[in-house]
Amino acid sequence: MQPVDTLGWIGFAVIMLLSLSVHEAAHAFVADRLGDPTARQLGRVTLNPLKHLHPVLSFLLPLGLYFAGLPIVGGGRPVPINVLNFRHKARDFMLVALAGPFSNLALVVVFGLLFVVASWTGMIEPLVIRNPYGPDNVTYASFLGDSVNHVEMWLKLGALLNLGLALFNLVPLPPLDGSRVIGWLLPRSIQFRWYALDRLGIFLILGLMYLGQEGRGGGLMTYFLRALEWGYFNLGLAVDAIVGVVAPT
């Protein structure tokens, strides 16, 4: 994907706010469905970004990662949950946590399908190679290629961002959502100590990921980037295959 210009970054910011809102609203919605009305009573079952944004996690963190040359991720204001309202406390807590990253994976699919629709309707112009001796060769835009306009760029950025948010939040370390799966599997006598690690905060995770870059003594960042690259590449192959089938000839 080629460098992003000013308009591209504006679109990226809007997509980021939308994605974080969907992520946090998914937590709140599932918690409410499982019997905990806390988030709903506080107005968190909504896609309104103003209800979910956090000054550090939603703004300063993504900017800091960008200037540090690291993958851009972010977060919203944590959704308040009272596990005492759940019938199956550990299991339901895990399901609420997984709702966030799975909502981002759903958005990955949405952006991929929007790319197909944009290609099919001509919003993303195909590359036409003129052939003076026969029919012109029409090549439709590739999800894995360079963007020809801002619509294409925004759709690719949306898919990449949400894939990154999903994978990052599934890292099984507190306070990320993936740690709730580990907590569910742990004996009840250890669960409290495991969840107490949440107090160390997201910046410990970022520190571990930064130290995990190649040549810095670890592999956490390397594995994250490889998973992100693998996921985006295979998404691109699937989207391009669908475009090739449904796009008009």
Predicted segments with their positions:
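Hydrophobic transmembrane alpha-helices and their immediate loop junctions
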Residues: 1-249
